[in-house]
From Swiss-Prot:
Gene Ontology CC: plasma membrane
Natural source organism: Helicobacter pylori (strain J99 / ATCC 700824) (Campylobacter pylori J99)
Membrane topology: Multi-pass membrane protein
Chief localization: membrane
Residues reported to bind a 1,2-diacyl-sn-glycero-3-phospho-(1'-sn-glycerol): R155
Official protein name in the record: Phosphatidylglycerol--prolipoprotein diacylglyceryl transferase
């Protein structure tokens, strides 16, 4: 047993309290994710105006729409897919976004679905650009290149918040014994950090490679969608399936099943891009 294995014993998921409200590391990490994604996108607009012919004010307006779509979609998606009492929320819709418990204590909004956030993001992007659909693929590409690094902070936030634990490490796994985290007296994979690396860093490198080698609007979001789906499918083998759902056919988790659907959506965007997008003009 090493110091890393027992890090949760010495770490408090609450960063500080402000006016009686407990601020969690996850909230701070999520704020960092938004800031990183925003400024990464601005940097891309400045460095490659031919690929991203968007004014800053225009992007700022779009970013608000996209972020709102992500938050709404992520929360509603969680309630519909993962929440055991989803029927209650369907009849008490306002409770989905209620940050207070029945006693009036602030507990924040807990439970977000990445795939739900993706749906919300796509809907928001379409609604924002419906008057000029030629820019839709440009917006999607811009988010595809700025989202992965922000995603890293989100998964680190999950780790600091001590949630979304990994599967139990087999006793014969030497690497697992080194990197595992003790949770309720069981050594588990740090799946949140594995996801941060695979779905964040690796996917970012994939999209950057695509940016260098492709000249058609819409291909970056396709590479992101396919790359994320693959990395999420792999990472799910180290992540404990949601207790209320378990696994399905072929022992696949809900995250893996949704990743398959994400591949289908990505291929649909690819078909749309090849028919409706023009190549980026060279200097």
């Amino acid at each position: 047993m090493n110091a890393w294995n027992t890090i949760y014993e010495r770490f408090n998921p609450i960063a500080f309290s402000l006016g009686g409200i407990e601020v969690h590391w996850y909230g701070l990490a999520y704020a960092c994710a938004i800031v990183v994604a925003f400024y990464m996108a601005l940097r891309m607009i400045q460095k490659d105006p031919k690929r991203f012919p968007i004014e800053r004010k225009e992007f700022e307006s779009y970013f608000l729409w996209a972020e709102l779509g992500i938050v709404l979609g992520a929360r509603i998606g969680y309630v519909l897919i993962y929440e055991p009492n989803s029927s209650y929320y369907l009849t008490h819709f306002w409770q989905i976004f209620n940050p207070f418990d029945s006693h009036g204590n602030f507990i924040g909004i807990r439970g977000m679905s990445y795939h739900g956030g993706l749906v919300g993001f796509l809907i928001a992007s379409y609604l924002y650009s419906r008057k000029d659909l030629k820019k839709l693929l440009i917006y999607l590409d811009l988010i595809a290149i700025s989202l992965p690094l922000g995603y890293v902070f989100g998964r680190i936030g999950n780790f600091l918040n001590q949630e979304l634990f990994g599967r139990i490490v087999p006793k014969d796994s030497h690497l697992g014994q080194i990197i595992g985290i003790m949770v309720d007296n069981e050594l588990r994979y740090p799946s949140q950090l594995i996801e941060a690396f695979l779905e964040g860093v690796v996917v970012f490198l994939m999209v950057m490679w695509a940016k260098k080698h492709t000249k058609t609007h819409g291909l970056l979001i396709v590479v992101y969608g396919l790359g994320y789906s693959l990395m999420r499918f792999i990472a799910e083998f180290y992540r404990e399936p949601d207790s209320q759902l378990g696994v399905y056919f072929l022992n696949l988790s809900m995250g893996q099943i949704l990743s398959v659907f994400m591949v289908i959506v990505s291929l649909g965007i690819l078909l749309y891009a090849t028919k409706n997008s023009k190549k980026i003009k060279e200097e």
